[in-house]
Amino acid sequence: ELKRHLLDQHSHLYCPLADGLSYLPNGIELVGASTQPLWHASLWVADDLLIMQKLDGQYCLTAASLCSPSSWHLAQKIGHSMARIHDPVPSLHQKLTPKIDRFFDHLMVEKPIQRFNWSLQANTNLAQFPEDKIIHPASTALYYRCERQTLTRLPQTNAIAFTIRVYVYPMMSLTQVPDALTQLKAAIDAMPKAVASYKEIIYFAPALQKYFSD
């Protein structure tokens, strides 16, 4: 399915190989073993690929190819339920996890869902890990991290494919987007303290003032 989609919709970028695809801009051959289909597919797209399946009444993360985590380790999440995975997120486990499971139950094959998430970081690295956390001085340059996430029900297995594509922008670039900094400040000001702490807003606050005061 993915191979056919890339060849149909992005034929200017890909051409077929017997066991994979060739990426035309640089000639790289993207091949993989048929016994590892998720790894095979992950070579073809920039998105991280995660698979969730319903086990014993709960959706669990059962497989993944992850290159750009947002302050978490795959080894600590794989095999666990959504409730366990989201436990560190303030208010989410208690209030939203049951709703997330119900939402997944109603996800239809022909209607994939797209959503976006954001955070701040102190460098351009796509991969962010919990141990990278530091207190950021006011002079530190900031970057806006945006995740484009999709959820798709797979027709044959009924599992859910969760994709994450990460983009990182210098905070200064938001000045070119009308009202972007104003809306970001409003979102931060309205954020519960626990969520602001989880997103490390407290550490970025001195540096943020430079952008919000201009």
Language model: regions and residue ranges:
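Extended, well-ordered protein cores
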Residues: 1-214
